[in-house]
Amino acid sequence: MKTYWFILFVFASISVSAQPGATTNNQPPAEGGKSTFTIGLKQVGSVKPRNVRDIEASNWLLGCETLDRDMADYEQYKEYLGPLGIKRIRLQAGWAKTEKVRGQYDWAWLDRIINDAVQRGLEPWLETSYGNPIYPKAGGINLGAGAPTSPEALAAWDRWVEALVKRYKDKVNEWEVWNEPNFGDNTINSPEMIADLNIRTAEIIKRLQPSAKISGLSMGHIDLDYADAFFKVIHEKGKMKLFDNMAYHDYVYNPDANHWHVAELRRVLDKYAPTVKLRQGENGAPSFGGFGRGALGDWEWSELSQAKWNTRRMLGNLGHDIECSILGIIDMNYASAGSPIKKLNVKGLIESDSTRRAIRPKLAYHAMQHVAAIFDNSLRRLPVRPTYNVNAPLAPGEVKYNKNTDRSLAVYGYEHNNSKKQVYTIWMDECIPNNSYQTRDMNLTFLNANIDQPVYVDIISGGVYEIPASQWKKDGNKLIFQNIPVYDGPILIADKSLIGTRNQ
């Protein structure tokens, strides 16, 4: 998506005012992938999902990880990939699974996945890790594993990467090196060592595929000191040009709470490579709580709060010009492969169990379909800012908004490249997503907004609603909305032309 860099912190201080007739939908959230969202507006349709074949490009990536360790089964979920609408999928190539005998690569399992994905219109983002125990000190095969260190292991690694790129360079254009080198209490993978591994791997990829886009770093949580040391090595060796982006994974309970931390990471990277992008390379929320299932276990999650979290993360990243990858397509059986995670990881968009079967799509699958259907490269981000004064003069093209609450809202705006019609994303961003559809009616005024026929869209359910003439008006450069239901899941106020719909 063609966008402009802007970090938006949205805090206004006008009195809280729940308007008469505010929606208080206290229905329990539906499980089983269905939404019970209801408001007082007239529903006129639903967001029409789009297949990846119908989308040229977008900001999104989808996690299809752990296939190299048989924690999930691609055959079980492959039919769900195209209809989701996210073109790029993250895969791990699995050195240890592919080279079980020295010098012999069995590509059959990976060929099957990559060939099928490409045939479906998907674009693999392929990671070269993990290590391989058939060589001395060649690293481990799981999350938190040490990287290869011995000369023999590094030579074998080089051969592996070269063989991998030669085989898939006509089908894979995006690559990644090593997953979460700083995970947990890992002290083996120093930033300097991992920087050197990233450089040697990227040089092999670029030699064989000069047009390749390579993601570096891929750290498991934002550690600014680790990142600084990593970037410094690459910069001092003059190798930053090898990398398209630096990836990070930062799991936080409130998906809107870490924008400041990402901005700090951006400032560190800017010291060394201001043109290298950041990519949020892995994130997602569980669909129920409990420790031992990976990150974010200490919360009573539901399918509804998972759907809110994932879509807030996606749209929050989009609003800050950060590419976003969501983990993952299906629940993963981590316990089967000696991972530090000992239970089923339930961050999947599809429910699974210990047999790795695909049982059904969760609510988050459908909610992310709605995001993918609307937000593609036909839109560009607008630098929208809050204002207290709706009568203040604006520069040409400047867009501002006002809200009748001192509660914090996330508000981002986008404009169609050709028609210049606009869509605004809005949600309450103060807290961890809850398990309720309860909304609060709010008044919103947009200055210089370009919307002729406004509709209200609930991203979670996909419902598209008419905003009646009694609830909106144009007054000069002001577009004024009254009694708009807002909650902690994303809603849109959009020009109707930007929302592909289907009948109920």
Predicted regions span which residues?
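Solvent-exposed beta-hairpin/edge-strand motifs
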Residues: 444-465
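Carbohydrate-binding surface patches
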Residues: 389-450, 492
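Substrate-binding cleft and catalytic face of glycoside hydrolase catalytic domains
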Residues: 81-244, 250-253
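C-terminal beta-strand-rich structural cap/linker in extracellular carbohydrate-active enzymes
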Residues: 465-504
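Noncatalytic carbohydrate-binding groove/subsite architecture in carbohydrate-active enzymes
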Residues: 191-324, 336
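N-terminal carbohydrate-binding accessory modules
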Residues: 21-88, 100, 115-123, 203-206
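Aromatic/acidic polysaccharide-binding cleft in carbohydrate-active enzymes
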Residues: 288-400
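Bacterial Sec-dependent N-terminal signal peptides
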Residues: 1-23
